[in-house]
Design a protein with these regions (language model features):
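Long, well-ordered, tryptophan-enriched scaffold segments
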Residues: 1-17
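C-terminal non-catalytic regions of proteins with extracellular/luminal or membrane-system context
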Residues: 1, 17-263
Length: 263
């Protein structure tokens, strides 16, 4: 589409802004406050066990302020971005700006800590394999909602719909194929923290981008907090009791991958 064919009186009819007027609207204090409150309200408390709760509390959350907190780094394997651009493996700090001092002190090992705070993301994977295609397959892999390797034993033999119009086949079945989440190490972090922390609490904070199978770690977590892309500050408000969580799950969490395939 050439520039000459664009409608003349729409988006760029008046391209000039009034900075003073923009400052009143974009990022104004009132709007930011409402936005932050919306983030807090969306956070869901999925589990709050009494097993390691402080005396006088029904659950382990909220945490008392002033504790020593261990927060492991996340390890993410090679993945694909938009247009299937290759992304290399990386290690990232889930709290790059540090733990605010009003909540507690971040320590470098579980042995020093009073509590472990493990940030994870729902399992993510690459659902297509050029290697599978080169070896005579159709290239399609199962989309796994669990961290450990998943083999699709109960998938359809023939897919409901065909694939790309450029393909010379219509069956995208992935029956019998295996896939693994590229953030499988999130599960390792939870299990390793559970072993290292002994009888001290482990709190899991999950960024939920899609449904996930939680049976792999639910028993190892004293509390599970789910959020859908909010700021870390809002999550910490819930964990340390500055905000009482009121959110509800907008999606179903499957028991296992068999339940996903059979629905």
């Amino acid at each position: 589409m050439s520039a000459w064919s664009c409608p003349p009186n729409v988006l760029f009819e008046n391209p000039y802004l009034d900075p003073e007027e923009s400052a009143k609207i974009v990022g104004c204090e009132e709007f930011c406050r409402h936005g932050y409150e919306a983030q807090q309200k969306s956070i869901v408390l999925l589990k709050n066990s009494a097993k390691r709760a402080p005396e006088g509390q029904k659950g382990v959350l909220p945490l008392k302020k002033g504790l020593k907190v261990y927060i492991p780094e996340r390890k993410i394997g090679p993945s694909k971005a938009f247009f299937r651009i290759d992304l290399p493996a990386k290690t990232e700090d889930p709290l790059p700006d540090g733990l605010p001092s009003k909540y507690g002190t971040r320590v470098s090992s579980p042995e020093e800590a009073d509590v472990a705070l493990v940030f994870i993301e729902s399992p993510a994977c690459n659902p297509y394999s050029t290697e599978d295609l080169a070896n005579g397959g159709n290239g399609y892999l199962p989309i796994t909602l669990q961290y450990r390797p998943y083999t699709a034993k109960k998938a359809r033999e023939v897919s409901i719909a065909g694939g790309d119009f450029r393909e010379n086949f219509t069956n995208r079945s992935y029956l019998g194929k295996t896939n693994t989440a590229y953030n499988e190490a999130d599960l390792d972090n939870i299990l390793e923290c559970r072993r290292a922390m002994g009888d001290k609490p482990v709190i899991v904070c999950a960024t939920v981008n899609n449904p996930m199978v939680m049976h792999e770690f639910e028993a190892e977590a004293d509390a599970i907090v789910a959020e859908f892309g909010v700021s870390r500050a809002a999550v910490l408000d819930v964990v340390f009791g500055d905000y009482n969580p009121t959110g509800r799950l907008p999606i179903q969490m499957p028991k296992d991958m068999d339940a996903v395939e059979e629905q």
